[in-house]
Structure formats: C-alpha cells, structure tokens
Amino acid sequence: MGVPADDPRRTKELLAVQFIRALLGPEAPEAMGLPVPPVMTHVHQPTLDRMGELRDAVAGHLDAVASHRMWMALTSPAALRTFMEFHVYAVWDFMSLLKSLQRLTTCVDVPWTPKGTPETRRLINEIVIGEESDITSPGQVESHFEMYLRAMTEAGANVEPIKTFVRCVREGHLIHTALQKAGVPAPAQEFVLSTLDLINVGRPHAICAAFTIGREAAIPAMFLAGVRNLPADVPILKQYLERHIEVDSNEHSGLAMRMLSAFCGEDVARWHEATGAAISSLQARRRLWDAVVEKVG
C-alpha cells in the first residue's frame, strides 16, 4: 500500500519504514509485508540512534504481539464477534490516549495561547484528523471508533455494552464505574484501566511511548495477520484493518516517533521511563489477546 514516488506523503513513508527498521531490525518492514521504498532518503539518523536501547528492549514484546496466535483462533463468525466485543475497548481508549497527547502538546483552552512547538502541534493534529475525522468512503467522514461500531453491527457483534459504556462516560461516571455498569469483559476493563492510569500520571514521554510503540508500531503487524484471515462477509472490518495498516505504517508511526524523540530529548531517565511504558502497553495488549483466545476456546 505504498504511495507513488512523486507523492508528497513519500517522506512520511520513508520515515515510518526507517522507524520500523530501527525498532525491529533492517528486514522487519519486508517481513511484515509493509511497503519499502527502493531508495531511503530523509533519514533522521541521530534520532534513530537514540532509539537503539529502546528498540532492543521492546523488540521481543512487539514480536509477541505481532505473531500472537489469536488471529488463527478466529475460525468462526462467533469467534470473530467475541474478538470485536473485546477489541472495541482498545479502539475507544486509543482515542483517549491520542487526545491526552493533543492536550499535552497543544492549547485546547479558551482563551487560546501558544503551547508547545509548532512542529509538535502539527504532528499531533495531523494524527488527530486522521483518527477522529477520517474520510472512510466517498462523502463519509467519521472517527475510526465510529467506523468500528459499524463493522461490529455488520458482523452481528453486540454493540450495546460499548454504547452503554460511552453513554456512562458522557454522563460523568468514573471510568471504572462506567465499565462495570456496561458489563464490559474483565480483560477489556483491565486493558482500559491500564491506559487511563498511564494518562492520569501525566508524563508526556511515557504517554507518547505507549502510543508510539504500543499502538502505532504494533498495529500494522497485528492487523496484517488479521486481514489475511478475515471472511469475505465483513468488508467494513477489513476496511478498518487495512486503513490502519496504511496510515500507521505509512504516516502516523513516523509522526509519533518524532514526537517521542522531542519529548525525551537527551534525558536518559525519560528514555528509561518511555521504554517501561512501551513494554507495559505491549504486555497489556498481549493479555487482551490471550483473553480472547481463552474466551473463544
């Protein structure tokens, strides 16, 4: 799904592929089935060098998530519905993670004042546009969360718990109360609460690491396995997975990596905390996938 050589998005694709190489090794993009441009330019080598220790620390955890046996367990429509009824909460809290980054890097208050660096503001706002108001089909603009709800309906999955949860949150209930009122599966509750705990601590570099490594770097490899095994009668889910493979491998991962570097700078302690947050995020994802496998039998 690479972009043409003369497309202005090519710089982002080059950066994203180099980012994945830095995290997982030089052959990783090819092994993941991601687009690899024939000539690598615009490489930010000093930034990638600083990612070296983080790369070594997270590589095994990334691989465990990317190659998880869960996708092979989704062998029936009922199993696929169970997966979606668990996974939708990761789709929802992805947006909370993203919006927390936007709040940390841009001014969302009135009256407005400049906050952060112009480049960081642009980076986060570009990602928010794509996730919160994507063009998912001609004439249709929606968030990826709303798209996922349509995919669940198409597949016959139960959307009432997630709708109840969102309604409770909108009404002002505490997150753990909303999760309980909605009857959210315990493993999905654990996943959401781990994300919200990280957000509430409020360390920008840790939040960005969870977003960059735990989500943006992991999603393309995870979803490639899913797309390959999907039945033909769930086209919206297939489109959702393919859209994330496209934007997260070609665009968003590179943008997120630049933000992570900006947050950590040359501070060794921040890089250490970022590494811990990334690993914790990947471990939470693995536990969620383990729970899906256990549920579908």
State where each predicted segment sits.
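Non-heme di-metal
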Residues: T41-G297
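N-terminal amphipathic/basic-hydrophobic helices that include classical n-h-c signal peptides
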Residues: M1-P37
